[in-house]
């Protein structure tokens, strides 16, 4: 916009120019990501591969139902589909509502602009391109633009570049060439921490840097989740087995009872063809029944329940899961890309070490004159202040984070900075600027009753204006002591700390009363150096070690300098003495690499410094190309594209709305430690799903071959449709609840991440399903032959015993499935597992009710007490054999 000349920025836009600008460049609102409609959200649940197999099974079942006029099985499958999809839909919708509440943004914040020659306040959303905006300390910048005036202006860019304090200027000679954005550019979403200025708006809404990042963050990640890949494989396998067995059975029966029985050459009328057609239809329906039996209706239910329960439990530990799949995907991650500020560190500047050379008691303030000078110097020579303390909470600061850190240190020394500031009469003040690199304040001191000049700033600059150094009650020549101070500064810089030097001068009444003249005399006394750091979160080193021991690589991606990033990596245990330059890179150097060159380096990288948002996004995509499952943590808008493209995006609860919108999980407590916990939940969840598959497929294996072999030997269908409904749906649902509610185990963190290409059914699972399934099949087929050979054949009583025996085998097998993959006893912790106890009672109670009162609907007759006891005790061998195997395993492991 060129309607305003720099010389006339104090006039601003006219109302007509505002209207034209808004028409041309739009309003200052970020377009919110398009939310899927409720019906689309629900239809997404049908993308589950197993649900799709269920839909095919429901269609075949419906064909049989129409022919036989028996709809129980069809209704059962449809109920299973509706339950599985409905639960997933409800939990994601519920999480979405919670997220919207968490992420409420207020676009009505008032902004000072110059229009029609007057300063006026307007809502942030009404700012247009060309507006002249007045910026004050503590205010958020409403749009992107060019600075027209900058007086000691410092900006917090941590949500865009990771830098908490960036100095801005309009003097080209003072531009920071290494800065991510030009020194005279100021961006929406950043905050003025010190000084003031005036800007001309050049971009609003989606055209701002934050808007561009937000738009990138809405680009959808097309990477399928590890669980989805496995369920697709499983659904394909089940489909192939079901259709193969059904096709083979149909072919055998069709040849045996149709092709070899009927002479087709003698058929002349439709009536002649009818018997053959009826037999063909009967065998076709049997084949379809086999397909229906083969499909594990309870699998989507189990997966959904497991994910839903995890969502709820993780919310109770301050982790808001927005996307249900993220619960499980966390268990498969192999790489975590994390930013530094606010994630690894506390994003709160603190005094690490006060080094006032003349103070005694290890830098503790006392009642001596030097302590008084330090206290008054920090209090009066500052523009920051602390907000009033809320009982039980630390006071919060407003202003330059470095100055706030100094005030917080005074506060911790039980010094009332505000009282000192109010008592000290300011005679003259020189605010901090990038040109001077120091701040000076001349006050009439209430503590010593004299005029005192206080100076603070870059230590090397302040020391250069001193003639002596206050050291243990003596004055030492500043030139002689300079090398000692420089060595100290170098040590602090290597520890990724900011440093400030402090000096003072007692001014006689006859001397000048302006700071510029007094400082120019170069006869100050140097008080010492204060090291200020953004400390790492206390739980981060242990959390990083936990992730590394679990086989997960951690990479720091930050806008900070290489030195600072490396020091933070060292402090958290990521950077080791043996690491070299191949383990770190700058964003600019990374951008220059071709994809082939970058692919060779990405797995070795531990640190990317001076990174821009696009660098982080590219890193994530290249890691995925290398087969990594990537989680990204971040709290700034700059993290949003990478958060969205990663398999799991983890935003911080105190992060920006754009970052949270792009993430899958929001860590409400901002704790990096929660990531390790989420990995543990995810891995345990995957094991629970595997346990359910073991239990479920054993049932399906047995049921499939019972129907097939039972038909081959010519017996009555051993299990009716309604009985199969109980076994396949009701028991599966109970089992899903029981196995999904198993709490996470710390032991999973000692394992390496599974490969996303590894099939969900492991070798041990295959052996268990085939071994246990074959044993059950031999037993049950033996029962069928025995009952058929007995006088009276297959009576309803014998079929009831057979049905109950079959159910009780699965009942005891549930105990084995609960501890599958471990050497623990099936009874370990069961007294605390109230869910499991209730489900055991529900299955037993349900079976008793069906047998005793099911009658014709379930084709059962009541059994006496002794028969019940015989079945329950005889089938329990399943559990005792499992217990013996696990006991032997425990003994051999010792």
Label every model-predicted segment:
Residues 1-752, 758-761, 774, 803, ...:
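Conserved cytosolic headpiece of P-type ATPases
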Residues 441, 714-728, 765-808, 815:
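Substrate-binding/catalytic subdomain of NAD(P)-dependent oxidoreductase enzymes
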């Amino acid at each position: 916009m060129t309607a305003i000349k720099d010389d006339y920025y104090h006039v601003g836009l006219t109302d007509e120019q505002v209207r034209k600008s808004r028409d041309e460049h739009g309003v200052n609102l970020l377009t919110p990501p398009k939310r899927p409609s409720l019906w689309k959200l629900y239809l997404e649940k049908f993308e589950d591969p197993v649900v799709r197999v269920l839909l095919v099974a429901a269609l075949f079942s419906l064909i049989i139902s129409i022919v036989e006029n028996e709809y129980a099985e069809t209704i059962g499958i449809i109920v299973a589909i509706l339950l599985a999809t409905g639960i997933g839909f409800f939990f994601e919708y519920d999480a979405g509502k919670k997220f919207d509440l968490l992420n409420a943004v207020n676009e009505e914040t008032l902004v000072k602009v110059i229009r029609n020659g007057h300063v006026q306040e307007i809502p942030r959303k009404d700012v247009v391109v060309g507006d002249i905006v007045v910026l004050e300390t503590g205010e958020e910048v409403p749009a992107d633009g060019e600075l027209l005036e900058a007086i000691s202006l410092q900006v917090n860019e941590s949500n865009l570049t990771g830098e908490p304090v960036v100095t801005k200027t309009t003097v080209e000679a003072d531009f920071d060439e290494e800065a991510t954005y030009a020194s005279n550019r100021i961006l929406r979403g950043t905050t003025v921490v010190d000084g003031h200025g005036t800007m001309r708006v050049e971009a609003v809404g989606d055209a701002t840097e934050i808007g561009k990042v937000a738009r990138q963050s809405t680009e959808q990640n097309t990477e399928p989740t590890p669980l989805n890949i496995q369920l697709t494989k499983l659904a394909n396998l089940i489909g192939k087995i079901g259709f193969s067995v059904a096709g083979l059975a149909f072919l055998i029966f069709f040849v045996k009872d149709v092709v070899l029985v009927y002479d087709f050459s003698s058929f002349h009328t439709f009536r002649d063809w009818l018997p053959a057609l009826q037999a063909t239809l009967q065998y076709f329906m049997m084949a379809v029944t086999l397909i229906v039996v083969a499909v594990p209706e309870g699998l989507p239910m189990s997966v959904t329940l497991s994910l839903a329960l995890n969502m709820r439990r993780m919310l109770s530990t301050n982790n808001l899961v927005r996307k249900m799949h993220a619960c499980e995907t966390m268990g498969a991650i192999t790489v975590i890309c994390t930013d530094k500020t606010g994630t690894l560190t506390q994003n709160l500047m603190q005094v690490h070490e006060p080094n006032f050379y003349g103070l005694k008691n290890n830098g503790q303030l006392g009642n001596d004159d030097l302590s008084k000078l330090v206290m008054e110097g920090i209090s009066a020579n500052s523009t920051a202040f602390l907000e009033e303390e809320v009982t039980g909470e630390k006071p919060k600061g407003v202003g330059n984070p470095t100055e706030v850190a100094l005030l917080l240190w005074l506060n911790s020394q039980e010094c009332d900075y505000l009282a000192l500031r109010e008592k000290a009469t300011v005679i003259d003040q020189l605010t901090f600027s990038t040109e001077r690199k120091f701040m000076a304040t001349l006050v009439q001191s209430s503590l010593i009753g004299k005029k005192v000049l206080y100076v603070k700033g870059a230590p090397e600059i302040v020391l250069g204006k001193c003639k002596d150094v206050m050291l243990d009650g003596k004055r030492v020549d500043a030139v002689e002591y300079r090398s000692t101070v420089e060595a100290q500064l170098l040590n602090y810089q290597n520890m990724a700390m900011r440093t400030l030097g402090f000096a003072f001068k007692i001014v006689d009444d006859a001397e000048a009363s302006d700071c510029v003249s007094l400082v120019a005399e170069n006869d100050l006394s140097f008080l010492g150096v204060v090291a200020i750091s953004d400390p790492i979160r206390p739980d981060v080193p242990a959390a990083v070690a936990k992730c590394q021991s679990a086989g997960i690589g951690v990479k720091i991606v930050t806008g900070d300098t290489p030195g600072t990033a490396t020091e933070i990596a060292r402090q958290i245990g990521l950077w080791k003495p043996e690491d070299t330059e191949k383990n770190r890179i700058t964003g600019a150097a990374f951008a220059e690499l071709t994809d082939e060159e970058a692919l060779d380096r990405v797995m070795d990288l531990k640190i990317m410094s001076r990174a821009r948002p696009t660098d982080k996004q590219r890193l994530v995509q290249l890691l995925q190309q290398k087969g990594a499952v990537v989680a990204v943590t971040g709290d700034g808008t700059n993290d949003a594209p990478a958060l969205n493209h990663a398999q799991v995006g983890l935003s911080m609860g105190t992060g920006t709305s754009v970052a949270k919108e792009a993430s899958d999980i929001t860590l409400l407590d901002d704790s990096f430690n929660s990531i390790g916990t989420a990995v543990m939940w995810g891995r345990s969840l995957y094991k629970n799903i595997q346990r359910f598959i073991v239990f479920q497929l054993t049932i399906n294996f047995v049921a499939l071959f019972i129907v097939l072999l039972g038909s081959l030997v010519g017996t009555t269908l051993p299990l009716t449709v309604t009985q199969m409904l109980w076994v396949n749906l009701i028991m599966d649902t109970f089992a899903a609840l029981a196995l999904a509610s198993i709490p996470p185990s710390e032991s999973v963190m000692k394992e390496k991440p599974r490969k996303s290409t590894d099939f969900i059914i492991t070798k041990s699972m295959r052996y268990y399903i085939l071994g246990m399934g074959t044993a059950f099949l031999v037993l049950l087929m033996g029962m069928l032959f025995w009952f058929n050979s007995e006088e009276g054949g297959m009576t309803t009583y014998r079929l009831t015993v057979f049905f109950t025996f079959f159910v009780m085998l699965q009942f005891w097998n549930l105990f084995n499935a609960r501890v599958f993959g471990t050497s623990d006893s099936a009874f370990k912790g069961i007294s605390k597992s109230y869910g499991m106890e209730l489900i055991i009672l529900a299955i037993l109670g349900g079976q008793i009710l069906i047998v005793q009162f099911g009658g014709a609907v379930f084709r059962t007759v009541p059994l006496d007490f002794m028969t019940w006891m015989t079945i329950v005790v005889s089938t329990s061998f399943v559990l005792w054999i499992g217990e013996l195997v696990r006991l032997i395993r425990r003994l051999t492991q010792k």
